Amino acid sequence: MTHLLDDLAWRGLIAQSTDLEALRAAMNTGPITVYCGFDPTAPSLHIGHLVQILTLRRFQDAGHRPIALVGGATGLIGDPSGRTTERALNDPDVVAGWAERIHRQLAPFLDFTGERAGQPAIAVNNLEWTGRLTAIEFLRDVGKHFRVGRMLAKEVVAARLRSEQGISYTEFSYQILQSLDFLELYRRYRCVLQIGGIDQWGNLTSGIELIHKVEGVDVHALATPLVTKADGTKFGKTAGGAVWLDPALTSPYAFYQFWINTDDRDVPAYLRYFSLKNKDELEALEKDAGRDPAARLGQRALAEELTTLVHGATECGKVVAASAALFGRGELAGVEPETLAAALAEAGLVTMPFDPPPRVVDALVATGLVESRSAARRVISEGGAYVNNEKVTDVDAQIDPGRLLHGRWAVIRRGRRAVAGVERAG
């Protein structure tokens, strides 16, 4: 059986680490405890967090015990990592609410009951111990172990000091609070490994140094890479903003479409980062995808697996059916209103009056599927226009109000792949 560290290396998930052979030796003696922190700086986690979440899952599947730490305290402070400006401070009640939501979001990924895995995951909130510290205790018991020179040398801090913005004492202290988390988890659970993104490396090593000074033991850190895109744009962002795990912020349909639209050049890396399939399964999938690139087998596998993980198999089935139906490969009438609304919002939706009913020519122009009425007439004459998957052959045809989907929508399609929606006004 492949050792977990070898699997992580094959997947490209180890960007930097402390002594891997020492970590391997610790893992070989029995299950270890590993943690990752998630700060509630927004009402939801986003797909950028999936690398760390799924790395915790891989450790649990290999028999180790994961701790998911939600930063109810650190979320009040703000991590300067990866930022050129100071974070806005959120109200404590808001942060507490976000922390609860994030705890719930982690449940589909980690087994907190022990029913699936031998080592049940643990959920903690660092406000539990940090919130009880007085300023004097913080400075005497924790702060005295940190040397300002070393803190200033951390790349995150150094970069901010070089900038016009600078760094506040609040954010400068963040690495001390994160280090305290590692120390507290070592004391409570004998946690010996912290994982995080490569932009967190300075914070990870600060925790290692604190534990060595206070407890006299050596612990470990493992940093995952920052996910990039071949086209140079930021991973996890769309024209509409971040891709969230919360279905109220990013619909399951939009979530699915994000992965379906993955650039062919990114698919092999993303499958290794995000899929729970093993090496043999992924290599077989990559070969199949390479033989028929047009079928987008890699994108479909990625989209279906991750949508199922995040939103459940039932919801994934709905969005797969809706996606097929929108492009003429399924029955539109069977798509539920909520799923259809999300799909059309993602595709592009315009509202039009139906008194009198709009002409298909005008709908094609209004939705942006063609640039002009003359182009719309040409598309219809050439047999390339569809309303609710029915071909339109009459250039003067109107959209029949009696055939609107759920009494509200019409799906307008040009050719095989250009789709938009029309919603009845009022």
Swiss-Prot record:
GO terms for molecular function: ATP binding; RNA binding; tyrosine-tRNA ligase activity. It comes from the Bacteria. One of its GO terms (cellular component) is cytosol. It holds the Pfam family SYY_C-terminal. The keyword GTP-binding does not apply. A motif ('HIGH' region) lies at residues 40-49. CDD domains: S4 (cd00165), TyrRS_core (cd00805). GO terms for biological process: tyrosyl-tRNA aminoacylation. It catalyses: tRNA(Tyr) + L-tyrosine + ATP = L-tyrosyl-tRNA(Tyr) + AMP + diphosphate + H(+). Gene3D superfamilies: HUPs, RNA-binding S4 domain, Tyrosyl-Transfer RNA Synthetase. The keyword Protein biosynthesis applies. L-tyrosine binds at residues 35, 174, 178. InterPro entries: aa-tRNA-synth_I_CS (IPR001412), aa-tRNA-synth_Ic (IPR002305), Rossmann-like_a/b/a_fold (IPR014729), S4_RNA-bd (IPR002942), S4_RNA-bd_sf (IPR036986), SYY-like_C (IPR054608), Tyr-tRNA-ligase (IPR002307), Tyr-tRNA-ligase_bac-type (IPR024088). Keywords: Aminoacyl-tRNA synthetase, ATP-binding, Cytoplasm, Ligase, Nucleotide-binding, Protein biosynthesis, RNA-binding. Its EC number is 6.1.1.1. PANTHER family: TYROSINE--TRNA LIGASE, MITOCHONDRIAL (PTHR11766:SF0), TYROSYL-TRNA SYNTHETASE (PTHR11766). Belongs to the class-I aminoacyl-tRNA synthetase family. TyrS type 1 subfamily. HAMAP family: Tyr_tRNA_synth_type1 (MF_02006). Homodimer. NCBIfam families: tyrS (TIGR00234). This is Tyrosine--tRNA ligase. It comes from Acidothermus cellulolyticus (strain ATCC 43068 / DSM 8971 / 11B).
